[in-house]
């Protein structure tokens, strides 16, 4: 069974940077050693945003974007190796999620697409890469997402305490770690995505630092109710979503009924949308004693305060409190999934994704010996 140093690479739907994590992994433990966040050039970020919202590309443009993202991920890995004074031979493999650009797990031909050419990463780092983690699960009838609940269960499940892990990235997803029950998990809806998109358009800021804009505004209740009527929120699990659904166009369609509103009030309403849709799903799933939050949203003081207020009797904390950096959780999970793949172990949970069976995930891109 392969064990040793692994690197996880994650570029999420929030597009706030490439997260790279170095960890030692074996069958008994996952020990994080180092991490860094690598910036995404504005031009690349905009290209990804455009394709996620349905802008048409030529095959040439699509191929160039795939190559550029692969090079970006390789640069991020090499920066971490240099910082840690490590060589390619010191790393067993890289687990790279890729950049999600489309996710459509239902319909006549279900599919999901994460780009960033893994061959570029192998060529530029000299390290074996495991990628394309989601499509095997979809081929077996699953949603292909979320995949991180399996990792949350391995690290954070408790024998008697009802726990849930909440990742608030661009999309928010919930892992249900309830003693005596199969692991559950699904996307609750928008996390930071709509909040980030709004303040980017209104103020040219990548995100609402310390929720300053949202805290200066007031929730527009009719707008909130209008957004909460979206059928995704009442759809039963298993379910997953992404930027191709909850994007700026989605927000604009709801705002048409509310002309002339204060931009800060919209920001406050979007924060409340995220908090309400998460808390409703926690309660509908039977509630928990401890909700452990990770991802960029765990740094949003307004979101954390609203979750605590909407979930009385639940201890709302961050995964940092149990020794796992909330900023690095997803990248660490894909390092672990790479280890599972090389060990020939399944990486999905049918109770989460709805797949017909457990399966080894991903494709292996071997480095030269």
UniProtKB/Swiss-Prot annotation:
<feature type="binding site">
    <location>
        <begin position="12"/>
        <end position="19"/>
    </location>
    <ligand>
        <name>ATP</name>
    </ligand>
</feature>
<dbReference type="GO" id="GO:0009254">
    <property type="term" value="P:peptidoglycan turnover"/>
</dbReference>
<dbReference type="Pfam" id="PF03702">
    <property type="entry name" value="AnmK"/>
</dbReference>
<keyword id="KW-0547">Nucleotide-binding</keyword>
<comment type="similarity">
    <text>Belongs to the anhydro-N-acetylmuramic acid kinase family.</text>
</comment>
<dbReference type="InterPro" id="IPR043129">
    <property type="entry name" value="ATPase_NBD"/>
</dbReference>
<dbReference type="GO" id="GO:0005524">
    <property type="term" value="F:ATP binding"/>
</dbReference>
<dbReference type="GO" id="GO:0016301">
    <property type="term" value="F:kinase activity"/>
</dbReference>
<keyword id="KW-0067">ATP-binding</keyword>
<dbReference type="GO" id="GO:0097175">
    <property type="term" value="P:1,6-anhydro-N-acetyl-beta-muramic acid catabolic process"/>
</dbReference>
<dbReference type="GO" id="GO:0006040">
    <property type="term" value="P:amino sugar metabolic process"/>
</dbReference>
<dbReference type="GO" id="GO:0016773">
    <property type="term" value="F:phosphotransferase activity, alcohol group as acceptor"/>
</dbReference>
<keyword id="KW-0119">Carbohydrate metabolism</keyword>
<keyword id="KW-0808">Transferase</keyword>
<comment type="function">
    <text>Catalyzes the specific phosphorylation of 1,6-anhydro-N-acetylmuramic acid (anhMurNAc) with the simultaneous cleavage of the 1,6-anhydro ring, generating MurNAc-6-P. Is required for the utilization of anhMurNAc either imported from the medium or derived from its own cell wall murein, and thus plays a role in cell wall recycling.</text>
</comment>
<comment type="pathway">
    <text>Cell wall biogenesis; peptidoglycan recycling.</text>
</comment>
<dbReference type="InterPro" id="IPR005338">
    <property type="entry name" value="Anhydro_N_Ac-Mur_kinase"/>
</dbReference>
<protein>
    <recommendedName>
        <fullName>Anhydro-N-acetylmuramic acid kinase</fullName>
        <ecNumber>2.7.1.170</ecNumber>
    </recommendedName>
</protein>
<comment type="pathway">
    <text>Amino-sugar metabolism; 1,6-anhydro-N-acetylmuramate degradation.</text>
</comment>
<keyword id="KW-0418">Kinase</keyword>
